[in-house]
Amino acid sequence: MVLEATMILIDNSEWMINGDYIPTRFEAQKDTVHMIFNQKINDNPENMCGLMTIGDNSPQVLSTLTRDYGKFLSAMHDLPVRGNAKFGDGIQIAQLALKHRENKIQRQRIVAFVGSPIVEDEKNLIRLAKRMKKNNVAIDIIHIGELQNESALQHFIDAANSSDSCHLVSIPPSPQLLSDLVNQSPIGQGVVASQNQFEYGVDPNLDVELALALELSMAEERARQEVAAQKSSEETEDKKMQE
């Protein structure tokens, strides 16, 4: 079991209202963030996760490193979706949050969602990546939506990589859930490999309330996605009839 402290960076820029991922880029990210948090926490009893946003024109730490699912869930409530994303600034702030972790034995990892155009200079990003490597910070990037970012992000990961500890996963729009696709990727495999075979990664015998909360949350998410898919189908049919 890997002992890690992980900062998760969610892109809440205005690009996240796009509906090319089910039901939107932003909601698809949130679903995946929940999955990553629970899998990380269940992978090791001393693992911790923190949460940041990188949109709204300024990165913001929503939750410092914690194992408290309630605190983490509350931090994601009513997040604004606006402005532009500051990827580089977000990485730097996340690294500082990891640097001040209480348990220095924990390995450091950043999991960043990027779903809007990268505005930073690529040379500066590569310098930042090398600094992350020097400070032993592993980075995973979940890239959605904006294909023009892929080259810059790949160069960033290449510069940050050490012993294949960093990953870039670019996921095009798909009828499948983003969380499922991430789960099947190298990022997901790294998280899930040592996980027990309990639904949602939680043993209900150890934490009944958490298992029930996850079950209800996933049921609500599935219902919302079904409504969104039905609405999209009806709108498409109406357009065809009008033509």
From Swiss-Prot:
Residues 232-243 have a biased composition (Basic and acidic residues). Pfam families: VWA_2. One of its GO terms (cellular component) is cytosol. One of its GO terms (biological process) is mitotic recombination-dependent replication fork processing. InterPro entries: PSMD4, UIM_dom, VWF_A, vWFA_dom_sf. Residues 5-185 form the VWFA domain. SUPFAM superfamilies: vWA-like (SSF53300). It is found in: Nucleus. Residues 205-224 form the UIM domain. GO terms for molecular function: K48-linked polyubiquitin modification-dependent protein binding. Keywords: Nucleus, Proteasome, Ubl conjugation pathway. CDD domains: VWA_26S_proteasome_subunit (cd01452). Residues 223-243 are annotated as: Disordered. Coiled coil: none annotated. PROSITE patterns: UIM, VWFA. Protects ubiquitin chains against dissambly by deubiquitinating enzymes thereby promoting protein degradation. The 26S proteasome is composed of a core protease, known as the 20S proteasome, capped at one or both ends by the 19S regulatory complex (RC). The RC is composed of at least 18 different subunits in two subcomplexes, the base and the lid, which form the portions proximal and distal to the 20S proteolytic core, respectively. Interacts with uch2. Belongs to the proteasome subunit S5A family. This is 26S proteasome regulatory subunit rpn10. The gene is rpn10.
